[in-house]
């Protein structure tokens, strides 16, 4: 299964030219947030691959106008062709803007707890999809780009094979890795775009579930 992860910065290769060519062979698109609605909608015209997304902290406009043809998996456990995905968008709260997706550590921890039963129902998760990184795991030094400590707890409890996030642009720090590992989890910073491949999930799990607030 070939997956395209995108976040924060629209890719010129996808947005301006060669879109169909760059999406050829892509089975699934994961958006980690902070991308214009029209960008995601544009991509739907050139691929049959589902586009799953969580909200970034700057996606306040999504409250009034969610991107058409895409699937919101925020606050959800979504299973696609056997791949179990937990979605948690937003960033740490760093100002008082009410139209943005910002959360305190306590608020995010509460969101995580609400997903426990859904994750248990499908036997765990394979991929954690978020906007922010985990605390101390390639997050930023400033308040706005600090990661969530509860994401470390998620990685410890569920041990997903993949953790895909955005928020911390790679050009913020030359030492930030695009890909690293934490235990048995491959951690991917999806800033702009990144393509990776995973084995096809267990065919016994190839059923489609939609839980929580996920919607199309």
Predicted segment positions?
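A generic local structural motif
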Residues: 14-20, 37-41, 71-73, 113-117, ...
